[in-house]
Amino acid sequence: MVQGRTVLFRTAEGAKLFSAVAKCAVAFEADDHNVAEGWSVIVKVRAQVLTTDAGVREAERAQLLPWTATLKRHCVRVIPWEITGRHFRFGPEPDRSQTFACEASSHNQR
């Protein structure tokens, strides 16, 4: 869930919560594609487990609900500090003879 310029998620005890607490810098990646093109985005973030009553109340105002019927008591806010990504179109592989010709030509010039 996006709140302001941050992302919130709820989690249970376990790996995600441990990673958020143990590391000051965390990254997550989102990818998607269709038949013609694809994209990939990597977001580097600083993660904060919300422990104060005020922080938890603010997160609850975002109506942050779990997708699955499991108990997820911990709220984590991630604050992005770097976003990178790429977009690419699918197509046929380049002609190998042209690729090798270019490589051989640049090798002979050395």
UniProtKB/Swiss-Prot annotation:
The protein's induction, as recorded, is: A member of the dormancy regulon. Induced in response to reduced oxygen tension (hypoxia) and low levels of nitric oxide (NO).
SUPFAM superfamilies cross-referenced by the UniProt entry: FMN-binding split barrel
| Name of one Pfam family that matches | Pyridox_ox_2
List the protein's name: Uncharacterized protein MT3215
